């Protein structure tokens, strides 16, 4: 079995797949290294190989890799920056500066679409990347995601305070808010949708011959109905990870 890890800024997304990658055995999201090992122990699955992508610091990533090797007895393959992989050419002036999660997501999108594509990852931050039909990464955009927008308002505005349940309830519709929670949550979501709409407009201009749209990340479902042509692929980073780090 192969353990795949996507170590983000706030959470670790994990899944165990069959050796050929065709079957997902189990999966989950945890908020700490301890939570990861508890989840793996509870799954009862024996892992033979492991590959991961991390946007953590080098020290934090190395600490996790060391623990994985000691606890699971496996070698760990880590995704690295590259100028070209899987038919896609990195579009950054300095390819090492492109976030690994973005790189893998656009690799995954191009692999699935097999033509020009727009890849939007809606997490703590929101990223949008454009890939041409011949695999040229044309660059992209980054903006705060819902968690960051929400946190900034609560941090810098004393009277904005509400819990997660209230936030979720506020997003059931997008009418003008009749409470602070509704006004904040709906306003932030409308900003997010506006960002995505602009990416679509740019993609239509850049790719007159047609393109695919891929949404991924924890908040992808919140903009799905605004982008009916999009494919929501929760594991898009893992699709790219398999391309960047093949395991024989």
Swiss-Prot record:
Major subcellular site: cytoplasm
Catalysed transformations (reactions): (R)-pantothenate + ATP = (R)-4'-phosphopantothenate + ADP + H(+)
Active site, per annotation: 101
Gene Ontology cellular-component terms listed: cytoplasm
Pathway(s): Cofactor biosynthesis; coenzyme A biosynthesis; CoA from (R)-pantothenate: step 1/5
Domain of life: Bacteria
GO process terms (BP): coenzyme A biosynthetic process
UniProt keyword list: ATP-binding, Coenzyme A biosynthesis, Cytoplasm, Kinase, Metal-binding, Nucleotide-binding, Potassium, Transferase
Keyword Methyltransferase appears in the UniProt entry: no
Key word Glycoprotein present: no
The record's free-text note on cofactor binding: A monovalent cation. Ammonium or potassium.
Binding, K(+): 121
Localization terms from the record: Cytoplasm
E.C. code: 2.7.1.33
Signal sequence residues: none
Residues that, per the record, bind ATP: 6-13, 124
Cofactor(s) for this UniProt protein: NH4(+); K(+)
Homology family: Belongs to the type III pantothenate kinase family.
Function description: Catalyzes the phosphorylation of pantothenate (Pan), the first step in CoA biosynthesis.
Subunit annotation: Homodimer.
Name of the protein in question: Type III pantothenate kinase
Species of origin: Ectopseudomonas mendocina (strain ymp)
